[in-house]
Amino acid sequence: MFRLLSSCCSCLRTTEETRRNVTIPIIGLNNSGKTVLVEAFQKLLPSKTDHCMKSELTTLLLDEYELSIYDLNGDLKGREAWPNYYAQAHGLVFVLDSSDIRRMQEVKIILTHLLSDKRVAGKPILILANKQDKKKALMPCDIIDYLLLKKLVKENKCPCRVEPCSAIRNLERRNHQPIVEGLRWLLAVIDTCQLPPTSSISISKNNTGSGERCSSHSFSTRTGMSKEKRQHLEQCSIEAKPLKSILQKEGTRLWSKKNMSVTFALDEPMKEGECSRRMRAQNTTKLCYN
């Protein structure tokens, strides 16, 4: 028995010593739900942080990693401090409010500056499309279109994953699991950063939230942004630029999204009907750039 206990203690000590330290700032506009997401991480994962002490730093344990999570303020003054964390960051988490259509233009400007920063370029970024439980929340594919993420990712060689989620206090643990899977994706990419980077956007087919609208079935069968919602987005945008014109100007192809299953390379010309065939054939959405 003593020998068995000694062996277990030795294994635990070895695990602690071999954990890789990873620094991940969590950023986004104010009221996007960053703090609630950090609280969800603390409930789902072992933590070394004293929850009674208010601090921007949270230390979490996930698999063989020890994560230093920085919850940074998203107001105008707080954003001035973001660049101080870029150099030491191994990857970033960007949280946005999927239902706050009026601020999408602001999010686009911030993401453009973020990904083009030399201290960020090439590093993976996990985008948490939060508040999917809200009635007017945009789907991840529509968010990618409007923010021109494909163009940004290709230009800056930043692997990117869009994870739909609904960070709600007192929500069941199982409904928060996709954000942990998104975090695992981020760590997996960080672990392979020594390899030549390949820039991509992937959309998780998982969905979290509450209510019928956010069930896995309803999420996989929604057809994308309706004409009315697209018009509403154009009207609510700060610069009020037509969405279709913006995308065509940037050379982004518009397509009908019948579900979340599509894989294609943008460097190759797409034939008519090709997208819908691939949507039926694949299980994961991933946009790859070579």
UniProtKB/Swiss-Prot annotation:
Highest taxon above the source species: Eukaryota
GO cellular component, one term: non-motile cilium
A GO biological-process term: receptor localization to non-motile cilium
Signal peptide coordinates: none
Binding site for GTP: 28-35, 71-75, 130-133
Keywords: GTP-binding, Nucleotide-binding
InterPro entries attached to this UniProt entry: Ciliary_GTPase, P-loop_NTPase, Small_GTPase_ARF/SAR
GO molecular function: GTP binding; GTPase activity
Region (Disordered): 204-226
Any Pfam family hit: Arf
Family to which this protein belongs: Belongs to the small GTPase superfamily. Arf family.
Protein name: ADP-ribosylation factor-like protein 13A
Lineage, highest ranks first: Eukaryota, Metazoa, Chordata, Craniata, Vertebrata
Gene transcribed to yield this protein: ARL13A
